Amino acid sequence: MRSHEWIDRRSLALHEAVATKLEAEPHLVNIARANLQRWLTTNSAAVLREWRQILESASLPDLLALLRSSSEEAARLRQSSPFAGLLTPEERRAIMSRHEPRRP
């Protein structure tokens, strides 16, 4: 598997876990909103503004679908995800260990 494919799969797995957590606790989306607000004070990257628009306008089901999507658009957005800090270190470690690159 090429390295970018592995990275995309790992990112998707992390965001699937984020989506599952948001289903149970929708208020956690405020972590992403706070991250974006903080990041936008020093970086006006278009993708951050795009995430802000998504978080302001998307319904929870639409947001969850985006986080779980394997589309190129979703993969592009996940590269600048505002969901840092939503998973606990233990949750993140468990996912990372399951998605380590395979050695030839």
What do the predicted segments below correspond to?
Residues 1-104:
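Basic, alpha-helical nucleic-acid-binding regions used in initiation and control of genome expression
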